[in-house]
Regions:
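Active-site acidic/histidine proton-transfer and metal-coordination neighborhood
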Residues: 62-63, 78-180
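N-terminal pre-domain/capping segments
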Residues: 1-103, 281
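Histidine-acidic metal/acid-base catalytic patches
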Residues: 1-2, 29, 99-114, 134-141, ...
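Acidic-and-aromatic substrate-binding clefts and catalytic sites of carbohydrate-active enzymes
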Residues: 10-20, 39-55, 76-80, 125-133, ...
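Hydrophobic faces of well-ordered beta-strands that scaffold small-molecule active sites
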Residues: 3-9, 36-38, 66-72, 116-120, ...
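An acidic, carboxylate-rich microenvironment
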Residues: 20-23, 168, 243
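Alpha-helical context
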Residues: 4, 9-12, 81, 85, ...
Length: 281
């Protein structure tokens, strides 16, 4: 199994980012993890890609044994909807703004240090899903034309996102036969109201597309406990890890990624143990 984690790098200072990435690489080496995911936030983009990632940070990435995934513009909170134009926006102008931002990011990293995966979001929902889907497919076609073969993937989203509802996410995968995707377990479990049978149905439905599943973002959740909790915490009515792996997680190419405990090595070891032990059942 391939494992990775998101250390939660933030653009407070360049020195701090370098220190945290170096610590993350050391932790990945200790644990034998294959992938580090970096989140590119709005603030990082506004500061400038070369300002944030150039120099020592890029040197560390180029010299690392680990591969990198880039999580572009995570949907932070519903109050950020006005600032996020989204590649599925029904209006051409804001959609083109987001496409230009994505192309700048892809061009920068493809020229300096290509990512193993670029994880993108559809944006916030402002209209009927069918309207968003048409716009999203236009954007994906444009990106595929500009960057054929570049590894892009879409993910299911938090509440309020275009791809937050299971049926909508499945419809996108059905309509886009070449699209790779990332599955966030905590968000998906929350989307079915922590109903174990509904979650099992969603997993069975996703199994048809398992060969296109690039990454599982592991997080736990339960009623009253939030939707982004560590796996190793015991929660009443929490996520069924074993069922998730058994249904969609056995492909050795899938990256099992942890994003709830930062770069804390002992906690990452517990997260990995929770997945690994469930896979052996």
């Amino acid at each position: 199994m391939r494992f990775g984690f998101n250390p939660g790098l933030e653009a407070h200072t360049k020195r701090e980012m370098v220190f945290r990435l170096r610590s993350a690489l050391q932790g990945a080496h200790e644990l034998g993890f294959d992938v580090i995911e970096i989140s590119l936030t709005e603030r990082m983009f506004e500061l400038g890609l070369r300002t944030v990632f150039g120099g020592e940070l890029l040197d560390l990435m180029q010299g690392a044994r680990q591969r990198f995934h880039l999580h572009l513009f995570p949907l932070a909170a519903p109050d950020g909807r006005q600032a996020d134009p989204g590649i599925s926006n029904p209006s051409p102008y804001p959609r083109s703004i987001q496409l230009r931002r994505l192309t700048q990011v892809v061009e920068f990293f493809e020229a300096s240090h290509p990512m193993q995966l670029y994880l993108i979001h559809a944006g916030w929902r402002t209209a009927a899903f069918e309207t968003h889907l048409r716009s999203l497919r236009r954007s994906l076609d444009a990106l595929d034309t500009l960057y054929p073969g570049v590894p892009l993937a879409l993910t299911n989203d938090r509440p309020g996102g275009v791809l937050s509802q299971p049926n909508d996410f499945l419809e996108l995968l059905e309509a886009s036969p070449n699209l790779r995707f990332v599955f966030n377990t905590g968000l998906a479990y929350h989307a079915v109201d922590y109903n174990a049978e509904a979650y099992a149905w969603l997993l069975r439905s996703l199994a048809r597309f398992e060969e296109r599943l690039a990454e599982i973002q592991w997080s736990n959740g339960a009623p009253g406990e939030g939707l982004n909790r560590p796996l190793h915490l015991s929660l009443e009515r929490g996520l069924d890890i074993h069922r998730t792996i058994r249904t969609i997680g056995r492909n050795p190419a899938i990256v099992h990624l942890f994003g709830t405990v930062g770069g804390h090595v002992p906690a990452l070891a517990r997260e990995r143990r929770a997945v690994y032990n469930s896979a052996r059942l």
